Amino acid sequence: MGFYGGGSMASGRPESTGIDSLGIGKILAVYIKDNENLAIDEDKLQLTAELIRVFSASPGRDIVSQVNEDGGGSFSLSLDLQQFKKISDIENFFINLEDNPKGVIPCMNAAVHKVLFDQWETNEFENVMKINVRLHNYPESSISLKNLRAAYIGKLVTVHGTVVKVSTVKPLVTQMAFDCGKCKTGITREFTDGKFSPPLKCDSHGCKSKTFTPIRSSAQTIDFQKIRVQELQKPEDHEEGRVPRTVECELMEDLVDICIPGDVVTVTGIIGVINNYMDIGGGKSKTKNQGFYYLFIEAVSVKNTKRQSAFENSEDSSSSAQTADVGDLYSFSQRDLEFIVKFKEEYGSDTFRRILHSVCPSIYGHEIVKAGITLSLFGGVRKHSMDRNKVPVRGDIHVIIVGDPGLGKSQLLQAAAAISPRGIYVCGNATTRAGLTVAVVKDSMTNDYAFEAGAMVLADGGLCCIDEFDKMTTEHQALLEAMEQQCVSVAKAGLVASLSARTSVIAAANPVGGHYNRAKTVNENLKMSAALLSRFDLVFILLDKPDELLDKQVSEHIMSLHSASGETSPALKKFKPVNAASQNAGYANMHAEGNSLLSRLRLDSEKDDDFSPVPGQLLRKYISYARNFVNPKMSKDAGEIIQKFYLKLRDHNTSADSTPITARQLESLVRLAQARARVDLREEITVQDAMDVVEIMKESLYDKLIDEHGVVDFGRSGGMSQQKEAKRFLSALDKQSELQQKDCFSVSEMYSLADRIGLRVPDIDTFLENLNIAGYLLKKGPKTYQVLSSSYSRSQSSRSR
């Protein structure tokens, strides 16, 4: 069957005089000589002539004028097939392109070649490098990796996925000359698909030699690289126990080095098959598994979503809408945009509460924690990421949830990973350091080392949820760079590189011993370094405190989830909402004024009787749109509120031993305010945004800094608890006793000693009274204490005996 369905058009084939057979044939020979399975026939000449006619017309000339030189004399043309479809009138062209791309694409290359060099008025076709037409934006050929089967061999397909492995760039020999070992006759061989195949016998008359010497200086090479693409799994397509599908892709010439591990790419290419054992000589390995072949993609074009500029995305709205299925993360159909506009118009200022309660609706309460997760999903604005002359400022918001077992931390994390446009969920007790960052693996075929991306790199531009964070103490150090500098540096096996990891981290951890101890700091409860804890913008502590009303509501909510009705918020109908103090006793102190953020975020039993969560797929589109197109700026009034709160924190935090309140906390406040404005799709941060963020930060700090007596101690974000402070104070007192040869000290002397060592206690007088009650100090008179635990005091008491 010809290219035009039966081999002829409605008007019949053109006369040979109508086609410049000689000129077209010479160009076509340049493009199909590499493939010994193709031959120049009348169908190819006719198709090339039709393509020349299309590219010579006015719209076609505009496309051809976009040819780029890629260095080394090679040329490429990026051709949008949706645009080409509008100007092309060639019958059955796209059907044949899908079914026989290896026959159609060389004709397109030759047609562009002819039109371009006719404009340059040159006919030296043999002396110029080839022009490669890179076809993209063809949704009709898109297919998921799990559906790649033998039926697609030789067809044009488009796949979308994450790059997980990239090999080094190597030269691939396409042609080489050989000298006959007997008669010295020169023979030139073309290597199809890069397979080295010397001549079998000499072509000279009378010479039957089978020995040949390759002339390596005559070798013609092209750049060659292999990448491995892993499918992007959507939550709705999740299949239990199925390993994510991967496919090897071969990139050649100008396509090499277009992506790195972690990039999301759209690969358009031709499905091919390869037998790993076909050309391995010697012994039994030659026949081993000879019937088994492996599918791979010979790339025609690769589109990297990270490297696409903004004007490319907005150049043709109709084409970008049609590729919504292929580039699910960064493209929006007309229906998506209509939903975003209607959702914002319908709920207005209530958008934050609606989205917040759509995050894991099966978990009752925890509004402030859900608010922090929601802000982390939207993220702040990243600045100076591409400017090498400035220090990049991260926009990702990191959250850690610490608490007693059984409070729904893991479910919150899984829900966040499912809602995020690009989310990965990992469990700490089954994760290695390399699995989190990047691994260097050895390719069994080439013996080369290559990078294999870990969770933080694969989640670049999205969210990485790490459960059981306390079980992976040895891997904590690997996260320090990724969480602040937004990249992962690796130096292994002679490979030194830095990979992007612009990822928000939401972690969940259980305290040491199974129950959170208020008498200890967060660091001591988690056995986590202060450096890592300070990188989290928000630290939430969930405690399992008995509360009759809250327990009734939670139990009612859980029972309804297992009932036949399946309602998501039935507790609202039977009970009135609890006040701010019911879920956490500490909230009452901070929100005595009544109109707190927590009370505004709660669902009301009367107004929200018909509340239904936003579906995850629509929520993903809304979040993706906000992250890509909304970049809020700080207003003057909002900036003043955030600055005042930060300066107030600095005033309270004066102890030398605690983790200091630094500019990192100020940047956290700015990021949270940007995320709060993004939720409402606003380009300016308002005063209300700043107040909401300050309140969320207060909740986080209040939980982190409160001690076992309910006293807020601004030194408890890190460092030591009061038990360790007491030991430190008594040790210093013992040294002072030995130095001065006395065991009685006045209160003023103890004050000066406490100042000298930077003692972190809320009240020094109460602290001394507690030591007196515990028997470490003995009150000898007004404002005088004897140190009973010092070695000097013990030696004096033994002498008196």
Swiss-Prot record:
EC category: hydrolase
One GO term describing the cellular component: nucleus
Start-end of C4-type zinc fingers: 180-207
Gene3D superfamilies: 2.20.28.10, Nucleic acid-binding proteins, P-loop containing nucleotide triphosphate hydrolases
PANTHER family: DNA HELICASE MCM8, DNA REPLICATION LICENSING FACTOR MCM FAMILY MEMBER
Subcellular location: Nucleus
EC number per UniProt: 3.6.4.12
Name assigned to this protein: Probable DNA helicase MCM8
Any Pfam family: MCM_lid
Domain MCM: 351-558
